[in-house]
Amino acid sequence: MSYSTQQDILDFVEDNNVKFVRFAFCDIFGTQKNIAVLANDLPKALEDGVCFDGSSIAGFMKVEESDLVLRPDLSTVTILPWRPTEGRVMQFFCDVEKPDGQPFGGNCRGFLRSVNRKFKKLGITCNVGAECEFYLFENDDRGRPTRIPIDFGGYFDMAPLDAGENLRRDICLTMEQMGMSPQHSHHESGNGQNEIDCHHAGPLKTADNVMMFKQIVRAIATRSGIHASFLPKPLPDQAGSGLHINLSLYMDGRNLFEGDIAPDSIAGSFMAGVLAHSRELTVFTNPLPNSYQRFGCDEAPRYVSWSRQNRSQLVRIPQVKGDNCRMELRSPDPACNPYLAIGLVLAAGLDGIENRMVLSAPVNKNLFDPSMAEGLGLETLPASLEEAVQAAEESEFLRRVLPEQLASRYFAEELKRCEALKHASDPVEYERTHYFNAI
């Protein structure tokens, strides 16, 4: 669907028996929220926006200044096909504004949009792709999630070892119905672990797609009596789940990641910026205490380094051709806010370009074996959420690029997570129990 005017939207609502319209957005951690507007009230909502209590959303507003307004992005309209066909449900992604129309510092979509505009001013087009992994678990007789994966399959296995094949098919077909472009679907390394990848798109479109993808997976899994979890490390003895971010840059129609990458080229400087700021970005790409159980094993990096092909590196350049040429950042996990994660990775790369950073030499060693890193002098990613918060709070780069309100409230909420974990009698079980159903 592609609609640009309010009248286009109203005509579509009438022609398609739409009765409910969701105005969707997310808090600073990427948890999706929404308010449903009945179709009869949609004209006013499109004209004036929808007012809501920002003090009730994590990291948004104080009680004494709580009013905020949702402004729908008309280009994101879509029907939710798993909802009833009679009295259909439609959804927009929204930006968040202050009541006077001024920008709101916690509007994560707005932050990503502003970073992308800076690239456009340089004549650079950014394409972003996301590889999202997730687990599928059985529910008990009362419909509550268990820790029992739906199968004992492994990487690229087929049925009957792969019990999620039909569910992945339903997810991909639903994505296509909603205008998304799934590319690959397969069983991952862990028991009950799955991956579905989307074709690359613009940064904002990809972040919207990640949010919608998680919504689709949960809805279809629930309909099938299965629990879907995007927790980075739901099972201690199985692979962690990542959200690998793939990025390519185009200038004058040419993919800057195609061919050899000179250390001082635009692509080289972009990569250098991402590597230089990777430690301070980690609190945004890996926002849970549980996230840090994934690093250093199961194809999740620990060291700040890059290479071609090598999956033990933080950044790698896949050996592909043409428009598929790209860099892949392997640290992010699916608990992150995709607007902030993608926006900050792009901002780090832009900082590298603007300051003409020079890309370091590649590290062609298997860094999943810690002994291979000895003597190389490599930085490591933070080993805990608390360490990640400290790195971010000390970052001059983040003070420059992030709205102060968003940064300070994000860090404060993350420190609360650290304190809650410290006071838990069983920290590992606390975080799995506390986040297992929510992420």
Task: Enumerate the predicted regions with their spans.
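Glycine-rich, acidic/polar active-site loops that bind/position phosphate-bearing ligands
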Residues: 1-439
